[in-house]
């Protein structure tokens, strides 16, 4: 569960929201108030923090926090 908490902290900081709002079901645009630029910057911050590359075609499929957690779990470098 530590991975979720790390991701949660990055998202909360990047989007300037309270960490309690960052739940697996929370959608970046609808629930967390992100715009398209916020999402791009968030993806870049997550790539840097977790050592993963999130291609544009994958990034377009990432709608909520749970999507990010699953992608990073599946692709994080050991």
Curated annotation (Swiss-Prot):
Principal place of residence: cytoplasm
What is a single molecular function from GO for this protein? acyl binding
Localisation per UniProt entry: Cytoplasm
Q: Name one GO cellular component term.
A: membrane
At the top level, the lineage of the source is: Bacteria
The Carrier domain sits at 1-76
Matches recorded under Pfam families: PP-binding
Give the pathway: Lipid metabolism; fatty acid biosynthesis
What keywords sit in the KW lines? Cytoplasm, Fatty acid biosynthesis, Fatty acid metabolism, Lipid biosynthesis, Lipid metabolism, Phosphopantetheine, Phosphoprotein
Q: InterPro entries, from UniProt?
A: ACP, ACP-like_sf, PKS_PP-bd, PP-bd_ACP, Ppantetheine_attach_site
PTM summary from the entry reads: 4'-phosphopantetheine is transferred from CoA to a specific serine of apo-ACP by AcpS. This modification is essential for activity because fatty acids are bound in thioester linkage to the sulfhydryl of the prosthetic group.
Residues the record lists as O-(pantetheine 4'-phosphoryl)serine modifications = 36
Oxidoreductase listed as a keyword: no
Q: What's a single GO BP term from this record?
A: lipid A biosynthetic process
Q: Which PANTHER family match?
A: ACYL CARRIER PROTEIN, CARRIER DOMAIN-CONTAINING PROTEIN
Query: What is the role of the protein in this entry?
Result: Carrier of the growing fatty acid chain in fatty acid biosynthesis.
Q: Which family does it belong to?
A: Belongs to the acyl carrier protein (ACP) family.
Q: Which NCBIfam families match?
A: acyl_carrier, PRK00982.1-2, PRK00982.1-4, PRK00982.1-5
Recorded protein name is Acyl carrier protein
Instruction: Provide the species name.
Output: Helicobacter pylori (strain ATCC 700392 / 26695)
């Amino acid at each position: 569960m530590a991975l979720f908490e790390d991701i949660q902290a990055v998202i909360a900081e990047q989007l300037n929201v309270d960490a309690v709002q960052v739940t697996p079901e929370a959608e970046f645009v609808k629930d967390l108030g992100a715009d398209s630029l916020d999402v791009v910057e968030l993806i870049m911050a997550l790539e840097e923090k977790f050592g993963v590359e999130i291609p544009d075609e994958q990034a377009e499929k990432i709608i909520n926090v749970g999507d990010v957690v699953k992608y990073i779990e599946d692709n994080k470098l050991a």
